[in-house]
From Swiss-Prot:
Oligomeric and partner information: Part of the 30S ribosomal subunit. Forms a tight complex with proteins S10 and S14.
Molecular function terms, GO-annotated: mRNA binding; rRNA binding; structural constituent of ribosome
A cellular-component GO term for this protein: cytosolic small ribosomal subunit
Keywords from the named record: Ribonucleoprotein, Ribosomal protein, RNA-binding, rRNA-binding
InterPro entries for this protein: KH_dom, KH_dom-like_a/b, KH_dom_type_2, KH_sf_prok-type, Ribosomal_S3_C_sf, Ribosomal_uS3_bac-typ, Ribosomal_uS3_C, Ribosomal_uS3_CS
Domain KH type-2: 39-107
The keyword Transferase belongs to this UniProt entry's keyword annotation: no
GO biological process: translation
Pfam families: KH_2 (PF07650), Ribosomal_S3_C (PF00189)
Protein name in UniProt: Small ribosomal subunit protein uS3
Family: Belongs to the universal ribosomal protein uS3 family.
NCBIfam families found in the cross-reference section: rpsC_bact (TIGR01009)
Taxonomic classification: Bacteria, Pseudomonadati, Campylobacterota, Epsilonproteobacteria, Campylobacterales
UniProt-listed PROSITE patterns: KH_TYPE_2, RIBOSOMAL_S3
Amino acid sequence: MGQKVNPVGLRLGINRNWTSRWFPSARTAPSNIDEDNKIRKFLKKELYYAGVSQIVIERAAKKLRVTVVAARPGLIIGKKGVDIEKVKEGLKTLIKKEVSINIKEVKRPQADAQLAAENVATQLEKRVAFRRAMKKVMQAALKSGAKGVKVRVSGRLAGAEIARTEWYMEGRVPLHTLRAKIDYGFAEAMTVYGIIGVKVWIFKGEVLQKGIQFEKKEEVKEEREPRRSRRGRQ
C-alpha cells in the first residue's frame, strides 16, 4: 500500500500536518476548498521564480493567513516589501478578501522533494538528458543530509515514440514505515514531445514520539521435561 498512495496523505496526523487548516461547515466547505485551490494556483504561477515548496492556508473566524515556504524568500518580499504588497493586492482582487502573507525559508532546498521535482522538470524542458537530470538531483539531496532518494519520470522520454517510466533510487526509502519522514514532490515538464511527469521521494529519517522507548524482550526458555522412553517395560 505504501508504494501506491501519496506518502504525505498516508502520514497525516502521524508526522505530517495538513496544508489547509480550518474547520468547515456544510455551507462554507465548498467555497473554502475552491478559494484554497485558487490561492495555490495564483501563488504558484506568480512566485514560481522563488522556488515555492509549500503553501499553508489557515482560517480563523474571518481572518485568512497564508504561509509561503520558499527557497528564495528575498525575491518574494522585494525591495522594502514592494513585491509582497503586489502579491497581496492580487490575492485580494482574486478572492475579494483581506489576506495576510507570511514568508518562510526552506533550510535545505536540495533536500526538499517539491523543489527537486521542479528542478528535474526545468532541466527536461531545457532538453537536458533525463538520466543526467535525475542523478544530479539525487546526488545534491544526499549531500544535503537525505538518507535516501527516489526519482521517477514518466512520458515520452528522449522523444521516444512510446511513453515509458524510468526510476532511480539511492539509499533507503521505506514507504511502508509510517514513522519514516518521507518528503514527496510532483512536477510536470512541458516538452515539445508532450508532458513528462516527475515524482520525487526523499527519506529524511525516522520520527518517534518523545517518551516512547522500545524495550528488548528477554528470551524465555521453557524447560522441557525429559522424554519418556518409548520402549516397553522389560
